[in-house]
Amino acid sequence: MTIHQSPEAFGYDAFLRQHQNKEVLRFITCGSVDDGKSTLIGRLLHDTKQIFDDQVTALQRDSRKHGTQGGEVDLALLVDGLQAEREQGITIDVAYRFFSTDRRSFIVADTPGHEQYTRNMATGASTADLAVILVDARHGLTRQSRRHALLVSLLGIRRVALAINKMDLVGWSQDKFEAIVSGFQAFAAPLNFTEVRAIPLSAKNGDNVVLPGTAATWYTDVPLLRYLEEVPVKSEERAAAFRMPVQWVNRPNSDFRGFSGLIASGSVAPGDAVTVAPSGKTSTIARIFTADGDLERASEGQSVTLVLADEVDASRGAVIATSDAPLTLTDSLDVRLFWAAESDLVPGANLWAKVGTQTVNAVVKAVHRRIDPETGQAGPADKLAVNDIGDVTLTLDRQIAVDPYAENRDTGSLILIDRETTDTAALGLVQRVVASSKVAPAPTASVTASAEPARSGGLLAGLKRLFGG
């Protein structure tokens, strides 16, 4: 592990190029109340030199007023930003923090441990690549620990760092550590995790967080940060079929027409055959345009403008996908919901469903079952209350293009929006695509379009800000 150097060390241009090209890992911290999630993130920020002098001064002042570490600096206050959190010593909202090393950039979400904030945790986990599940070494696995392991599994996170915290308070006992690891592995066996990496640490003292600790001579593996630097990122998304929801149609003049968006999965190159959903029109990629020039290939996570060889009618909400594995068109979905609204969800409820860049009307046709968030077992249900997880069938007012969530997290997820308040009511994961009651359009191709680039300086400046490759 190396902490990133200052820009003065080797020049600003080189510094910017180095950090622009680094991979980004999004991860969440979760666990029971007072397991030390916020302290762990504070330690990562502190020991990777991400805190400015004025923040240190403010932290020392706040530690005297709100701290829980006696006379010592309370690193948790770097993350617990709400007044209610500081006064209660708990995390309520999802707090996002950013930091980087020479090897990788990180976006970390500190998610709440209380049951009543399950919806907040689901929000933080929905975009994460990895979960850091904290366990207090004194208490071992708790009901909340198991609940969070199940939730991150349901949300498609396949890699877990089991951070057994406060090991200094149990004398760095190897027996205690191994007992917790064994219990977690037994519970997580049916949860389909591809990797569980157990790390003993002390977030308060910094042992095995950024730098190796010296107290546990029996632990010879890497500290937490080194694991976060080395774990594979987005490997499943890169291997998945190409998908790009259209954010806007880029047509600055009559000679140029392209479709701009963020590639959700897979990769694409000029000459590749693609299908535009929901129209079913087919074409090939003529150009991959960015403000910095054309690309020979673009992949997951890049914002680009795709120019097609044919004049295809598409707008915001459409999805461009590889013709080898097109999306399914449907107006009915079986969805697993993480219900966040205070009012109960019952059959007949009318909401908006936002899928990618498209928003449609959705009616709850049926509520089938509720999932116990501690055991994963399903039971019959006719409604969902706040923080419930359940399976429902949605009927939409028109066809949309989707994948099952197990195949693609981006094109297989949605949010439900309350039509009266416009509040987010639920996070939804597509479990099964129900056969559509409408006839899907036949794939067709159209008139060849011009692939000549736009030459406007103003356009290029705008593209560099918004859709630079």
Swiss-Prot record:
It catalyses: sulfate + ATP + H(+) = adenosine 5'-phosphosulfate + diphosphate. CDD domains: CysN_ATPS, CysN_NodQ_II, CysN_NoDQ_III. One of its GO terms (molecular function) is GTP binding. This is Sulfate adenylyltransferase subunit 1. PROSITE patterns: G_TR_1 (PS00301), G_TR_2 (PS51722). Residues 89-93 are annotated as: G2. One of its GO terms (biological process) is sulfate assimilation. Heterodimer composed of CysD, the smaller subunit, and CysN. SUPFAM superfamilies: EF-Tu/eEF-1alpha/eIF2-gamma C-terminal domain, P-loop containing nucleoside triphosphate hydrolases, Translation proteins. The keyword Nucleotidyltransferase applies. GTP binds at residues 31-38, 110-114, 165-168. With CysD forms the ATP sulfurylase (ATPS) that catalyzes the adenylation of sulfate producing adenosine 5'-phosphosulfate (APS) and diphosphate, the first enzymatic step in sulfur assimilation pathway. APS synthesis involves the formation of a high-energy phosphoric-sulfuric acid anhydride bond driven by GTP hydrolysis by CysN coupled to ATP hydrolysis by CysD. The keyword Nucleotidyltransferase applies. Pathway: Sulfur metabolism; hydrogen sulfide biosynthesis; sulfite from sulfate: step 1/3. Residues 165-168 are annotated as: G4. It holds the Pfam family GTP_EFTU. Residues 110-113 are annotated as: G3. It is an enzyme of class 2 (transferase). Keywords: ATP-binding, GTP-binding, Nucleotide-binding, Nucleotidyltransferase, Transferase. Its EC number is 2.7.7.4.
